Amino acid sequence: VYKRQGQNVVAADRITVEREARERQDQQVTILIHKPMGYVSGQAEDGHEPAVVLVTPQNHWNQDTSRTRFNFAQLKGLAPCGRLDIDSVGLLVMTQDGRVARQIIGEDSEMDKEYLVRVTYGDRDIDVQSVFPAEQLARLCHGLSLDGEALKPAKVDWQNPEQLRFVLT
């Protein structure tokens, strides 16, 4: 029986989760959507709608074999796992389950996140790869920072002559 937070246990102790807690956990949803351009990942901002408005019964995958069916209560507490800019398109994972979020974006996450980025260099937007300096590509792999903090190294290579593929862990 749970007595207090942080209670110590020994190997011989038996730990179970009460049925009510399991059922509550089972009711949490994770939703995958393809975010189109023009929507923000999280809260509405600057007059732009959040991607969560795209989650409707009409957009439910028709081959879903789970017994879970859409209801508007599922939108409460739904948070994006990561961020796609308003001009970005791609897979957006939204969840009510903190365990899922930590697996995807937690500090210790080892899950790769892949981005394709259309590149211009100077006034060149066709066959950019042929004029893009190799040292700048190397810098993209090891010299990125955000808000003054160095980021983990990224894998960066050419997807095609106009697009770079970034893989972030």
Give the location of each predicted region.
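Basic, flexible Lys/Arg- and Gly-enriched helix-loop patches that mediate nucleic-acid binding at interfaces
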Residues: K3-T169
